[in-house]
Structures are given as C-alpha cells and as structure tokens.
C-alpha cells in the first residue's frame, strides 16, 4: 500500500516503478491537513501530551500523517494479513523487489511486529556511516540480509515498513483516541504499545527528500529549532566512543551465542 496525498503529484513516478516490476499495489489517499477545520483538529489531537513528550506542538501535517497510517493499520487488522506500507516519495532498491517482497509472512512475524525497511532523511552517501555508528545489537539472517534491533531507536521516519496483524492490533490499541505522538516515534510504540520494532539491514527503501519537496517538512521546520554545525563537531568524539562500545557489545553477544550454539550441538551429539 502506498500512502499519498491526492494533490501531491508524486503518484506517477512510483506507480511506474512498481508496474515495471510487476508489483500489485494500491494507493491510499492520505488525510490532507489543509482540510482540517479548527474544531476538528482540536478533537483529533492532544496537544498537552505532545508537548510533554517533545517540548513542542505537532504540526497539522504530522497529525494527518499519523491518522493516514492508522487507517492502514485498521485495514491490516480487518484483512488479517501483513502489509508493506510505503510513502509516495519512496525510492526502492532492487533487493526490495527480489527479496523483501517474496519473504514469507510467518518468517517476518517471528522476528517482529514491525520491520523498518528504510530511514527518512538519510542519503545513500551516508549509508555506510549509518551502519557503522548504529549497528544492530541482535539480528537474524534472512536471504543474505539481517533483521534485528539497533542500539537506539528514534523518530527515523516511516518511508517504508512491514507490519503484521499482531503489530496492527497493538498499534491501534495503544494509539486509540486523539493523536498524542509522532507516527514514527518508534521508542514510544515499543514502550507504550509493547510492540517489537525491528530494522532491516541493509536498507532497501529510501526517501527522496533531496529531490522532492515535502509539505510535512516545511511545516515542521517552522516549529523545530535548528542546531549549529559546531554542536555536531563537539559531539563527534562522544559518537566515536559510543561506536567502540557498541561494537564491543555486538562482538560479545556473537561470541556468547556462538558458544551457546556449540554447547547445544555437543549436548545433542551425546
């Protein structure tokens, strides 16, 4: 399913890509924030909860985005089948078509309730750095790729993800009522909703943020303070230290799992 504003003008591009690969897909009209009336917005959104979590209000676009995806979760629940959700500015790698689309539903369901297939606002030129600084703590192999849990989960976008019926059930249950958080606040879905959120590596879905304008980002930038480059420079030594610790933990986990596997094999041989 592809979430798309009817007025966005983006549908032709992604429809051509999907049709080229013979993929069965449908567009779902996203809720248009520009059509909100003040009274309606107040009913659909809990500003106090949002400000308590983020220190700012959510934009009308962010609220509309959440409501749009919630409609899809309801469809997953009613159909009883998992779904891959894409936004209309998604760029798709070949592995999306040759691997991800043919993976068994039950195999993915054993790994998580939601599997993030990509990350918003990440350019391909920074892909290797992202994997280096944000390794998966624990992961399972599937078709030469990995699905696992990163050390840190954050608001990394919803440009592409897989969701199971169980995931849809949990998501709908804990987000019932007025919108009070960002759609892509994955730590919130994990902690408040009890959902298992995994990530695919390498990513197969990218956001065309460098070439396509976004209503949501334009609105959000007016409410979010910008940080200077000096801050990134000061934090770089901290990031390097954290990187070393994380990879040490990954190595320790791999050694422990290998030792456990070896012990199980010896026990079975007896």
For each feature predicted by the language model, list its residue ranges.
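An acidic/histidine-cluster motif and surrounding catalytic segment
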Residues: 1-86, 90-270
């Amino acid at each position: 399913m592809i979430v798309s504003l009817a007025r966005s003008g983006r549908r032709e591009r992604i429809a051509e890509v999907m049709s080229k690969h013979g993929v069965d897909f449908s567009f779902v009209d996203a809720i248009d924030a520009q059509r909100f009336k003040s009274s309606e917005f107040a009913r659909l959104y809990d500003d106090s909860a949002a400000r308590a979590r983020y220190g700012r209000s959510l934009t009308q676009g962010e609220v509309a985005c959440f409501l749009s995806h919630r409609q899809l979760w309801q469809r997953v629940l009613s159909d009883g089948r998992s779904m891959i959700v894409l936004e209309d500015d998604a760029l798709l790698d070949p592995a999306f078509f040759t691997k991800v689309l043919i993976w068994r539903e039950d195999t993915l369901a054993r790994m998580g309730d939601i599997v993030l297939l990509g990350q918003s606002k990440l350019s391909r030129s920074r892909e290797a750095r992202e994997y280096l600084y944000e390794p998966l703590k624990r992961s399972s192999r599937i078709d030469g790729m990995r699905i696992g849990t990163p050390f840190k989960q954050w608001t990394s976008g919803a440009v592409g993800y897989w969701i199971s019926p169980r995931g849809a059930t949990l998501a709908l249950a804990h987000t019932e009522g007025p919108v009070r958080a960002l759609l892509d606040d994955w730590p919130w879905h994990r902690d408040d909703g009890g959902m298992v959120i995994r990530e695919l590596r390498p990513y197969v879905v990218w956001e065309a943020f460098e070439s396509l304008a976004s209503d949501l980002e334009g609105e959000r930038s007016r409410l979010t303070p910008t940080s200077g480059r000096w801050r990134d420079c000061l934090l770089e030594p901290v990031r390097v230290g954290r990187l070393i610790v994380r990879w040490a933990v990954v190595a320790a986990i791999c050694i422990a799992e290998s030792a456990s596997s070896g012990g199980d094999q010896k026990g079975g041989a007896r």
